[in-house]
């Protein structure tokens, strides 16, 4: 006999929700199936093997207060806001696979009057009025030690402009070994059903979940108050919210950037591993390359973010007061470009 749980998060914090998801996954008992429903506010979520700098515009995100969250599953980068419903199916049933949860999602949408189909391995699509298939859901699957995990998103009324705005990185010369997101043509469910909301979708998914298992359970509301004192959860949350996980876990990559100032051209070549600059070289045709050669050495060993670059440049500029204007231009350029 399989037991069921229906879990609802009252938090919009992506680090909390992803930590909660991981905690539930690691602690689910045998012969249990769980549906966890949640939402994130203004977040870019990237896959476990992705490079944040390649997938999204980190400078815009930092300026606008958009969080970055790296999940523990694979897949591509997605933008979340409150027009997005997240679902997670977790099970320790012996014969469980993602086709079960995928069909629950399709049936849940059908209950609220939306016809959708599976496309490829991980996507759910709808057919628009002009006959075009558009993606409304992407998902990822993982399995370890008898525990199965399938999570994904449903686009209800996501701000598509923000999706494009934050998921389009700056034009940078990046070479990376990470997994690159494949941009798909997406659609919001409110194009088919105006006024659709999170509560309505959750009711549809819940009904399909109960229908599949032939039983009903009361929903459990999960909040930060329930979990903040649990050491295992707290450890997971610290990891999930840490720069070293969200940015530093990126695969090794190379960043080359160049520009021209009135006094000469500058090309910076950096090799980054786990979010740290491991090698740096600057090429320039300036009449005195010495300050830039010193800067290249100072960049080695610091985190690849604009705060660290700013601290490095401030210290560096103090050693060359005679070049204050030129070095200020270089500093401003680096801080603006590396973010």
From Swiss-Prot:
It is found in: Cytoplasm. This is Lipoate-protein ligase A. Residues 29-217 form the BPL/LPL catalytic domain. SUPFAM superfamilies: Class II aaRS and biotin synthetases, SufE/NifU. It comes from Blochmanniella pennsylvanica (strain BPEN). GO terms for cellular component: cytosol. In the transfer reaction, the free carboxyl group of lipoic acid is attached via an amide linkage to the epsilon-amino group of a specific lysine residue of lipoyl domains of lipoate-dependent enzymes. Keywords: ATP-binding, Cytoplasm, Ligase, Nucleotide-binding. The lineage of its organism: Bacteria, Pseudomonadati, Pseudomonadota, Gammaproteobacteria, Enterobacterales.
């Amino acid at each position: 006999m399989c037991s069921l749980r229906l879990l609802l998060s009252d938090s919009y914090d992506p680090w909390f929700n992803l930590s909660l998801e991981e905690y539930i996954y690691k602690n689910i008992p045998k012969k249990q199936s769980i549906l966890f429903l949640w939402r994130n506010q203004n977040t870019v979520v990237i896959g476990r093997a992705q490079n944040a700098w390649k997938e999204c515009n980190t400078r815009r995100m930092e300026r606008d207060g958009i969080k970055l969250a790296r999940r523990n599953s694979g897949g591509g980068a997605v933008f979340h806001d409150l027009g997005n419903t997240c679902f997670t199916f977790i099970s320790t049933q012996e014969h469980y696979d993602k086709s079960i949860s995928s069909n629950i999602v399709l049936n849940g949408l059908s209950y609220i009057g939306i016809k959708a189909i599976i496309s490829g391995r991980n996507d759910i699509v709808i057919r628009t009025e002009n006959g075009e298939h558009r993606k409304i859901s992407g998902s990822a699957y993982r399995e370890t030690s008898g525990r199965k995990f399938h999570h994904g998103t449903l686009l209800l009324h996501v701000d598509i402009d923000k999706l494009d705005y934050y998921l389009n990185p700056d034009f940078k010369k990046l070479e990376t070994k990470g997994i690159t997101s494949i941009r798909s043509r997406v659609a919001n469910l409110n194009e088919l059903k105006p006024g659709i909301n999170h509560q309505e979708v959750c009711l549809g998914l819940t009904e399909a979940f109960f229908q599949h298992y032939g039983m009903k359970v009361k929903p459990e509301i999960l909040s930060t108050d329930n979990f903040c004192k649990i050491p295992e959860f707290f450890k997971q949350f610290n990891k999930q919210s840490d720069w070293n996980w969200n940015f530093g876990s990126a695969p090794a990559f190379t960043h080359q950037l160049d520009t021209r100032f009135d006094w000469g051209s500058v090309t910076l070549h950096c090799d980054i591993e786990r979010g740290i600059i491991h090698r740096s070289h600057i090429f320039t045709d300036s009449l005195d390359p010495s300050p830039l050669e010193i800067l290249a050495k100072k960049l080695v060993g610091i985190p690849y973010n604009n705060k660290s670059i700013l601290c490095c440049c401030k210290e560096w500029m103090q050693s060359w007061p005679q070049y204050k204007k030129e070095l200020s231009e270089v500093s401003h350029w680096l801080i603006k470009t590396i973010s």
